[in-house]
A protein has these predicted regions:
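An acidic/histidine-cluster motif and surrounding catalytic segment
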Residues: 1-97, 101-301
């Protein structure tokens, strides 16, 4: 295990970024260079939500598609990239990221990338390396849960082939499919098979590890909209705070065997409720000032 260079062997990252979001692009590039990660920027401008008239004909089942236009644009952008990657590359894996992830938790990992790959169950299709779940975040390896959504992922080539088979028909995209997962078939405008939050992680054997969180300071879509401001404040900020709390103060309480497994009563103690961490100070200043009594507040609340 090489804790001096934890990301040795980490695959090339393909990250999606709109041309006008230089703030997000610069944020990601600075992190990649800091951690010596090979990367490729994928422009999301080919399928802009504001220019849907140029590409909506590519959705084979457009008459039945009810999700928000930016969600469709994002879905097609990812599928378009995967088609190209699958055709032009022979790599066994591919790593995908959006442009708002916070990689600084790597500094707190107690293992390296080789250990992660070595510990993955042999039947995996997808490794979800970061996720938000308001019902509770499991800080250990586990199969994907119903309310998990898209995050930084490592995909096997065979799984990419399956995704393309399910959602690509010639030059068009089939985005309306039957979904039995109640977390993803209730809200017609934001949930369903036609969002990357579902089809990229819920259509195969996905295992999850809480390794990477979000930078909650960025809005999404083509600008920092008020809708995304509300979403970020109520979702991503809580998740980010919870991730930082675990990696800064809780990870040493559990062994690697416990972190890379699931299914015991011990693992129930490794679930944290994001709503408890609304006021958590990830800078460490409050902990430095109040010591263990500061942590006791979150452990007991």
């Amino acid at each position: 295990m090489d804790l001096n260079y934890k990301l040795r062997g980490f695959p090339k990252v393909h990250f999606f970024n709109l041309d006008n979001r230089k703030d997000r692009r610069n944020w990601m590039v600075e992190q990649f260079e800091c951690f010596d990660i090979e990367y490729e920027r994928i422009s999301g401008t080919k399928y802009l939500a504001s220019e849907s008239s140029k590409w909506k004909h590519l959705i084979k089942d457009i008459d039945d598609y009810k999700l928000l236009v930016p969600i469709a644009a994002n879905a097609i952008s990812h599928l378009d990239f995967l088609k190209t990657w699958y055709k032009e590359s022979t790599d066994p894996y591919v790593v995908l990221m959006e442009d708002d992830y916070d990689l600084r938790l790597v500094d707190y990992w107690t293992f390296d990338w080789h250990t992660i790959i070595e510990r993955l169950p042999y039947d995996w299709d997808c490794l979800l390396m970061g996720f938000e779940n308001p019902d509770g975040i499991r800080f250990h390896l586990h199969p994907i849960e119903p309310a998990h959504d898209f995050g930084p992922v490592l995909l096997k080539r065979s799984f990419v082939e399956k995704i393309l088979d399910l959602h690509c028909v010639g030059d068009k995209y089939k985005l309306v499919n039957t979904v039995a997962n109640a977390a993803w078939n209730r809200q017609a405008d934001v949930a369903g098979s036609g969002t990357v939050d579902y089809f990229m992680v819920h259509t195969g054997r996905t295992y999850c590890l809480p390794l990477i969180t979000v930078n909650a300071n960025f809005g999404s879509f083509e600008n920092n909209s008020i809708i995304q401001k509300f979403y970020r404040s109520e979702g991503d900020i809580l998740a980010r705070n919870t991730y930082y709390y675990y990696w800064q103060h809780e990870c040493d309480r559990y062994s690697l065997d416990e972190f890379f497994s699931y299914g015991t009563s011990k693992h129930n103690d490794m679930i944290l409720k994001p709503r408890k961490f609304r006021t958590y100070d990830m800078t460490g200043k409050s902990y430095k000032l109040y010591g263990e009594s500061y942590l006791d507040y979150f452990r007991k609340s």
